[in-house]
Design a protein with these regions (language model features):
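Sec-dependent signal peptide recognition
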Residues: 2-10
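C-terminal motif of bacterial Sec signal peptides marking the signal peptidase cleavage site
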Residues: 13-16
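Mature soluble binding/inhibitory domains
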Residues: 18-326
Length: 326
């Protein structure tokens, strides 16, 4: 279970008919251990947020289906429909959603497949209801052969979903937390650099911004012209099966601050594509300067927000050119 604006999800994505593989806190912590905070590598699949499995087929009648288990209860497969109002202009990710009536959780999703069909990824989240949210991401690999070595470069678009947003339905009269919420999306550019000689990968997500629907949003402590910080995907190892995981950082006053993790899979002959996922927590919204309570005239840097904001995201990228060697 996940505390609203906080801690992971229990999801399982499955796709359609042909069944192709698709791949310092300011609140009290939950009573149980948080789950799904680090990417988990499986067979041709990497998940985060306790996504158990995923199949995505953009050509199927029902490209995306999602199974959400609330507190380990009965899992029910749901078809996610195309969400036209959730599309973001120029973003090469398909938009989906599911809501079983206007008084239930509103789940928003984005998914994409590489141009060669070798990898795909999906991210799903609701914005919260009844003091909890459920969300996560998955990357999957259809096929892969490793290059003999050299540097691979991958550039393109990133999309993430946060565990807060605007009301997306109605609860009973007088209800507060019972009103469902739709996740805001965050978009950006991503650059992945992979060294297949050394078996290492790293990258950066930059030009990050909230979608237009969140134009009025400012995290707690932010003022004026607010900008999301760049997030660096620090060096991680590439396994023989093309999977990888690593940490994510922002830079604060010259210091590197961990804000989460990333993972994914390379795909295609000689790693022509890559699908990745992210999970960012406390600090990913940036920091603010406040007056020091102990040093007159001094300032301290504190994370924006209330400390429980979470972002799950994905990227699906094609190689931008032939590999180079030193």
């Amino acid at each position: 279970m996940n505390k609203l604006i906080g801690f992971g999800a229990v999801l399982a994505l499955v796709a359609a008919c042909d069944q192709r593989p698709s791949g310092d806190d300011t609140v009290e912590p939950p009573t149980q251990e948080p789950v799904g905070e680090e990417p988990v590598v499986g067979t041709r699949q990497v998940t985060v947020g306790d996504l158990n499995s995923a199949l995505y087929n953009p050509d199927a009648t029902n490209p995306l289906r999602v199974r959400v288990s609330l507190d380990g209860g009965v899992q029910q497969l749901q078809v996610y429909g195309v969400y036209v109002d959730g599309r973001i202009a120029g973003l090469p990710y398909e938009s989906y959603s599911f809501q079983d009536g206007g008084d239930s959780r509103f789940f928003r999703a984005f998914a994409a497949e590489s141009s060669d069909g070798s990898v795909n990824a999906a991210v799903v989240s609701d914005g919260g209801q009844f003091n909890r949210f459920f969300g996560g991401a998955v990357a999957n690999q259809e096929n892969y052969s490793a290059p003999s070595g050299g540097l691979g470069r991958y550039r393109g678009d990133y999309v993430g979903l946060v565990n807060f947003g605007d009301p997306a339905g109605e609860g009973p009269e007088g209800a507060g937390s019972g009103v469902p919420t739709e996740s805001y999306a965050i978009t950006g550019d991503v650059f992945i650099l992979a060294d297949f000689t050394e078996g290492a990968v790293n990258g950066e997500i930059f030009n990050r911004e909230f979608e237009a629907a969140a134009a009025g949003y400012l995290p707690t402590g932010a003022e004026g012209d607010y900008e999301l910080p760049n997030i660096v995907l620090v060096v991680g190892d590439i396994a023989s099966n093309g999977s990888f995981t690593g940490g994510a950082e922002i830079t604060v006053d010259g210091q590197f601050v961990n804000v989460g993790s990333y993972g994914g899979l390379f795909g295609g002959t000689n790693a022509t594509s890559v699908a990745g996922l992210t999970r960012f927590g406390t600090g990913f919204l940036g920091v603010a300067e406040i007056a020091s309570p102990t040093a007159p005239g001094g300032v301290i840097l504190v994370p924006l927000g209330n400390g429980n904001e979470i972002e799950h995201g994905i990227f699906v990228l094609d190689s931008t050119g032939p590999f180079t060697t030193d």
